[in-house]
Amino acid sequence: MKLSDTDIRRYMAEGRIAIDPVPGEDAIGAMSVDLQLGDSFRVFVPGKVSHVDLAPPGGIKGRDIEALMGHVEVGENEAFYLHPGEFALGITIQRVRLPADVAGRLDGRSSLARLGLMVHATAHTIDPGWDGRITLEFFNCGPLPLAMRPGMRICAISFEALMSPTSKPYAASPTAKYKDQLAPLPSRLASDQSA
């Protein structure tokens, strides 16, 4: 069951869903909450490795991923520029905490998509039990560079109540790769292969 704005306000008032900083009333839509862009990004650094082997037997190495992506901080009143065909990771300002019986769904803004900005390449589900800021997977599929500024409304999160709590809340899992993230983290695919 999707939560309406009334449900979202009630869940937040009860402490079942936490969003920090707390969104203003203007950020709460009919069934979602707008989230803002943070100031931290990860970008691919060309020429660091020859390729990324996504599957065994070669397997991906954690050090290769770290070498692939550089970290960029954008200052106050500055913009991060995403050029056509480029991919980058970003992060929300807000930290989101979900209970074991609520999942989140991340959606890009239609107005930004109409200018060529994809906000999540694949990862739109926020698992029950999540606690942290949300990494965004940006891709510019338009013809012009896009200037993205920290603090701008970048996406919306909606919520679904599960019929029962999951037995595997994300933050409680010892193998959760991205729990408590405060900055955009590069892929941790290598930890899948070592498990």
Curated annotation (Swiss-Prot):
HAMAP family: dCTP_deaminase. Catalyzes the deamination of dCTP to dUTP. Pathway: Pyrimidine metabolism; dUMP biosynthesis; dUMP from dCTP (dUTP route): step 1/2. One of its GO terms (biological process) is dUMP biosynthetic process. The keyword Nucleotide-binding applies. InterPro entries: dCTP_deaminase, dUTPase-like_sf, dUTPase_trimeric. The gene is dcd. It comes from Rhodospirillum rubrum (strain ATCC 11170 / ATH 1.1.1 / DSM 467 / LMG 4362 / NCIMB 8255 / S1). Belongs to the dCTP deaminase family. This is dCTP deaminase. Gene3D superfamilies: 2.70.40.10. It catalyses: dCTP + H2O + H(+) = dUTP + NH4(+). It is an enzyme of class 3 (hydrolase). The active site is at E137 (proton donor/acceptor). PANTHER family: DCTP DEAMINASE (PTHR42680:SF3).
